Amino acid sequence: KYKLAVKTADAILAKAPEHGETVAIKGLVLFSMHEREEGLRLTKLGVRYDLNSFICWHALGIVHRMDRNYHESLKCYAQALRIEGGNLNIIRESGFMQLQMRNYLPFIDARLVLLRTQPHLRSNWVALALAHDLAGNKTQAVRVLAGYEDVCRDIPKHCYEYSEVVLYHASLLEEMGDAHGVLDLLETQKAHIVDEPSSNAMRARALSTIGRMDDAAIAWFAMLERNSENKAWIQAYLDVVATNESRLMHLLDLKCKFPKSTMIRRMILHVAQNADFREQAREYVEYALVKNVPSLFLDLKSLYSQPGKKDMIEEIVEECRIRWDPQTGDEGHGPPSSYLYAMYYLAHHYSYTGQTSRALLYIDSIIQHTPSMPELHMTRARVLKRAGAYEAAADAMEDARLLDGQDRYLNTKAAKYLLR
């Protein structure tokens, strides 16, 4: 209610035109209303009228902070604290300014004052620990968090805030290389930890660090039973149980145990070579094409940098296209959508490999069959853009936009292509 605030301030100033605090607050309000120059002038004038008012200095500090003049803001907060040293709001805000300026030691002092004044607030404990962490003193940060955990009583069940404090404590111990401390803390606070996946991951990493590889493998496998699509967990499990030569064997074993995991099957393609790759890629590609996965090319594009894999993928998709072609009269061909998505993949593939004419042949055939899909016209536009035909690409993107005029993404892309 900025207008009402200005009106009230004007009413006061009509009777006391040199009342510094009112002038400063009016300047702060005007600054918040984007009247920057007038707001800054009035705030400084308010300080000049009443140099001994912490409110005037506080208002000027806020204005400088909003103006991102953090150095001047700190000076104003320091002056306000000389006048009103026990004001917690000013102490808190000055601490934030010290943090903004990367002055970690004064930030620690500010947070320590707040903690001593309000030790019942969890945020003060965590903020002090974070201040020590940012200053590079992780040992002191751990001591602060341990002190907080010692004074906590009657912790309710499923208290996510307390759980996060414990996990932050564990992460600091992990960064310090104290794997035994991580295990002890997680075991002691097990009943209060809500985020079990993060806790289990820390525990598994700690077990690996101290050399208990069998226990670490069991821990990682238990996590894969919970979520077999997490690439980081799969990678960590392989680092524990497999060498570079045996990674494919262990991945195939995981594939048998988690047959629905797409991530495991995708990681197999990265590791497998030659005949093994062809076999696994055929299964992966056919499954994705039958499921009509439009992002298949983006998924497999990273494999093209590995020798021979690009050509094998091309052969597999071409074989699928020929086998599923409805014009062959083969009764065993797949659904029409699979044939179209095979051609859709090949259009991306040939455009990426520089065979523009073949890419256009495939994408034009799909558009002739299904002209109402904006994605097909967008792909045609990308093929033409990659070939350097910017005007034709803009026309193709405009065709895509006209199919759904309310789609902001299509409108933006069409405008971008026209600008190009």
What are these regions (language model features)?
Residues K1-R420:
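Non-TPR docking regions that flank or precede TPR/alpha-solenoid scaffolds in eukaryotic proteins
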